[in-house]
Amino acid sequence: KGGVDLYYEAAVAGAIPILRPLRESLVGDHIQRVMGIVNGTTNFILTKMDESGAAFGDALAEAQALGFAEADPTADVEGFDAAAKAAILAGLAFHSRVTDSDVYREGITKITATDVAVAKSLDLVVKLLAIAELTNEGKISVRVHPTLISRSHPLASVRESFNAVFVESEAAGAMMFYGRGAGGAPTA
């Protein structure tokens, strides 16, 4: 209304203080990529599928029973929540106005226990990643989708309802912000 932006750290990645570093600490650096696990519900589900071979529906039911997932989990499992967070991260990282409609979005509902098992056999893990990066043409690409990542990548170690944001910049290099991402207290 008044042409001002409001910043709430819990709006992206729960208890992780990521908005202020992007807006203030790294403002003089040239960020090349921001990618992260920004939805604790989907990370919990994918972790259960990876660790115990659970089916998607069973892992979702457990997330709901523990209070990590809403009764209607559509916003989480279809990637809408992560897309909104990706837009916020991209806007701050690249000093641009980015909206949810600018974000390619794909959720995790089509991921099967077999998909996760095959990934595991290849020393990979499935994560729903929000990715914002500058293309070679200098444009901003923002997307949310299930991604296969090496188990040696720092994001692969993010389990259960935890979130993490991995930032790659020209001066600072690679850094990861990590913390609780779902549930009442982390998102309050």
Ranges and model annotations:
Residues 2-4, 28-33, 139-140, 162-163, ...:
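Short coil/turn connectors at secondary-structure junctions
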Residues 49, 58-157, 162-164:
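Substrate-binding/catalytic subdomain of NAD(P)-dependent oxidoreductase enzymes
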Residues 31, 35, 74, 118, ...:
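Short, flexible coil/turn micro-motifs enriched in small/turn-prone residues
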Residues 36-39, 145, 168:
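Short beta-strand segments
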Residues 152-188:
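ATP-dependent carboxylate/acyl-activation modules
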Residues 7, 33, 45, 127-128, ...:
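Structured core elements
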Residues 2-69, 76, 80-81, 88:
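Rossmann-like NAD(P)H-binding beta-loop-alpha module
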Residues 12, 134, 148-150, 173, ...:
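Residues that cap or initiate secondary-structure elements
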